[in-house]
Amino acid sequence: MIRAKHISNLSSSARSFFLSGSRPSAADGNSCTCAEDESGVSKRQQIRTEVVQTGKRASNLAAGLAGSILPVEAGKPLVVPKTVEHFTRPSLLPQHVSSPALPGKADSVNHASAIIKEDVGVPIGDQIFKAGIGNVNLLSDIANYKIPLSDGTEVVGLPKSCMVDPTRPISGVKSSNVKVIRREHLAKVYPRSADRVPINSSPGTKQASNDVAGKSFEAHDLLSNNVSGKRKIMPQRPYTDSTRYASGGCDYSVHSSDDRTIISSVEGFGKPSREMMKVTPRTAPTPRQHCNPGYVVENVSSILRRFKWGHAAEEALHNFGFRMDAYQANQVLKQMDNYANALGFFYWLKRQPGFKHDGHTYTTMVGNLGRAKQFGEINKLLDEMVRDGCKPNTVTYNRLIHSYGRANYLKEAMNVFNQMQEAGCEPDRVTYCTLIDIHAKAGFLDIAMDMYQRMQEAGLSPDTFTYSVIINCLGKAGHLPAAHRLFCEMVGQGCTPNLVTFNIMIALHAKARNYETALKLYRDMQNAGFQPDKVTYSIVMEVLGHCGFLEEAEGVFAEMQRKNWVPDEPVYGLLVDLWGKAGNVDKAWQWYQAMLQAGLRPNVPTCNSLLSTFLRVHRMSEAYNLLQSMLALGLHPSLQTYTLLLSCCTDARSNFDMGFCGQLMAVSGHPAHMFLLKMPPAGPDGQKVRDHVSNFLDFMHSEDRESKRGLMDAVVDFLHKSGLKEEAGSVWEVAAGKNVYPDALREKSYSYWLINLHVMSEGTAVIALSRTLAWFRKQMLVSGDCPSRIDIVTGWGRRSRVTGTSMVRQAVEELLNIFNFPFFTENGNSGCFVGSGEPLKNWLLESYVERMHLL
């Protein structure tokens, strides 16, 4: 029987890192600030052409662990070792783009949330970048009854591939399972561009004036549509100056020794005008009976943008002298991004003589608070709404469902769904579409499809937008054939696909690496009379890039400009990402510089792409400078940023690289670093580790599932390769129990189970398989029922440089051989190991199955 013990010097050395006094406590001043960019997910598995011996890699990890991942001392700058070439490139910071000032916390509004205990200025997992045009998320749009247009004017978030995928090879060799597309076949789509944009000059039309510089932009879901092709100026969402986060009694905090205040150099953006700074005696407002309503809305909005809510804002509004009705108030509230300012203005209006809020203003305020996850304030507001005689309607409930859903509070969203029906409000298409979307994104596809069925039973036949939502959900859940069937059903039912639907289908096929099908759909879309929008161009650029045709992708960029589409940060970020994945660091860098020259402010996903490129080619000093530039710009390293750094540390081939990655992890200031540093020893039953992981995942609740999956994969792989295998097993069990890996284990039919490991790193796959087989053994001993068949899916290396060299498959096959698992393969599928019948039952009775993960 295999016992839990230190197998080598590696284990004891690695364990000393977590158990020694060097592990800082909350009092040591090691803390984190964190905010999240739009999703983009860093997939953990890194394919290598050679198999590195476990013992050799393990010893390298152990040698570099102690002290390598400790946070930098307060006030002491990170010293780049002399062995690293000094960074000599031009500045990573924009030369003429200033970041706006960070307003302080509102002092006149005191908030208590029933669910969110602390107000995080930029919520983790929900850092949004405003794309500079009038974009709104589809579900938010339809929740507001703003039906998106289909005129090709939408800019939405790029697919998650904008985040650098470490599983892709550096070289341009394409996997053999992808049908090769010859360049001549692309002539009907996009030829090489003769007038390709010069990289060293500004590739985009610089339309942002000085008052646009430094503002943040919002990336959106694939289902969004915009209402204007022109860039719309939006103020940057303020960042809260707080650097402390706590959850469930666990402090993941960092006390920064270098508090930076970024002041906007843009004249008049972050400060009030001289006229408004003058102190004037308070006089009664002079009603302007014949004032243009648009004039009032514009000027009040301008005042509220200049001031944080407080005495100065009230004074400015009083001096302006106006009479506002509920309609105008609603228009102002819709333009406000800071919930504290919006709430202060809302209650100030309520105190004005003759003013009365209506259902529209209450509903808009519910949406503002929902975006900030201020659910305690929402409940108070709903009570006031009822007391004021404004009964919540379907739109109000839809806003609330959407707010809970985007914060991953699915149970609360369903409770609101039930409450609205009890209150006599009938759910509409928007209600069902929202519930379908949030459950599918969280991995609960069965509930999503059940809601689709209930919608049809309620007599709500799906329209184009409903079909688009469900097709997107099915595709993102990995059910592309079902999504395609629904697309065909949609056409058969007389629902004409719009531009959004085509964009979804093209993106799904591109994600599935069906590049030729994606390009065919693109041609079909044009033949149907739809002109490409910025989303379409971005998807086609990605398809061409993954086919190895990066020059043609640049040609698409040039045509996009010729059609008067102004490239934004995600478009530039895609080109940075594509060239980085191709191993061309210089081209990736040139596109990053082109973005700065176009007057655009970098966003976190683009920085992550460039960071991954530097790490991949071991340019550590450049990675360090990029990370510092992010902090100087006020960009908070995201969960994906930390996942990249931890993955690089795990796969480091020298103690120097490992130590430097550890220092970068500390510099990032992400709460995940404190979580890793405070990892307790497993103990006799592993309960301390499970509690620690559970508290952290609760703290990171609002992060999207794919981001959490990427981090947990990196953590389990790191612990496994460091010899901390008991801890790795406990981390996996908690992550699986919290549905971080919804597709890892599935019962295909009665007593026929599927274990899906192909999206994991090799270390995580070994731990996941070991603990899952141990669970089967435990269930069999308790109930006497044994699975009749188990399929273990590893994939066969389609993402490897050479097909069939999947590191996951090799690691799993080695583990099964060591323990004499009675497996076989079917139909020549080397990426699926099958065990069944009596041999499987006899094998599960062996006692060593319980301790496989310790080998």
Curated annotation (Swiss-Prot):
Keywords in alphabetical order: Repeat
Q: Which InterPro entries match?
A: Pentatricopeptide_rpt (IPR002885), Smr_dom (IPR002625), Smr_dom_sf (IPR036063), TPR-like_helical_dom_sf (IPR011990)
* Residue ranges constituting the Smr domain according to the UniProt record: 755-838
Gene3D superfamilies membership: 3.30.1370.110, Tetratricopeptide repeat domain
Stored SMART domains: SMR
> What PANTHER family does the entry give?
OS03G0856100 PROTEIN (PTHR47447), OS12G0638900 PROTEIN (PTHR47447:SF17)
Query: What is the similarity comment for this entry?
Result: Belongs to the PPR family. P subfamily.
Name by which UniProt lists this protein: Pentatricopeptide repeat-containing protein At1g74750
Organism for this UniProt entry = Arabidopsis thaliana (Mouse-ear cress)
